[in-house]
Amino acid sequence: MGTPSELVDKLMSDIGAIADDIQDYVRHPGADFTRMRKMGAGDVIRALVCMGAGTLGHELDGFLEAPKACTPSAFCQQRAKIEPEALLQLLLRFGPGVPARAADARGIRLAAVDGSEVVMQRNPRDAETHSPKSNGSGIGYNSVYATALLDMAGGAFLDAVVQPGPAKDEPAAFRELADRCDPALVLAGDRNFAGYNNFAHCLERGVGFVIRLKDSFAARLLGAGPLPDEADEDVELLLSRSRRAELRADPG
């Protein structure tokens, strides 16, 4: 499998599989998508994946055949029934199925980790994604932050973590991706992901990593010197009720 038509067929098959189990991914199981509608669960997911950047009305025009035409309002109602987990599961099903080029002579497969902010329609009532700060407009904006894992050999996204924009935490997203990825991958990340916690997390998980360091971080790391065999250290401590300087200088 590697031709464009084969990849499209694989994507449509994976969408169909998610739609068949849609009750696992709806907000109200047993109620949502239990009646026949112009747009079923598979149609909604396919639209979310395949739509362009035009207005919703323009994108819906021609998406379904005339007898099944759907208004933007009806589409939004159907879309609201589906949990984001459905799209994550679609990504996890489809991404690993994209054929990758062979690893290098050492058997190494690199996967890049990077994040990007996605600005959405402004909605001050959505406190989770709304930020009052903006580029001088003073009205704020809504956003989410997506940290994705890209197979550099196959060019396919393997996984992603989406967080509210105002509360983004790239190191935490990195650790979540490291937990879910194939241990055979080597994760490559920029300076935002550098940290002892992330390094230790990958080592415990058995995942290789190549992360760019800030100059100050690298200097501290290289200047740390060899670590002792144990963390325990003997210290002498004087306990006294006196605060006299002479006693502190010569406690003997």
Describe these PLM feature segments.
Residues 1-252:
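Conserved, well-structured functional cores that handle cations and Mg-NTP chemistry
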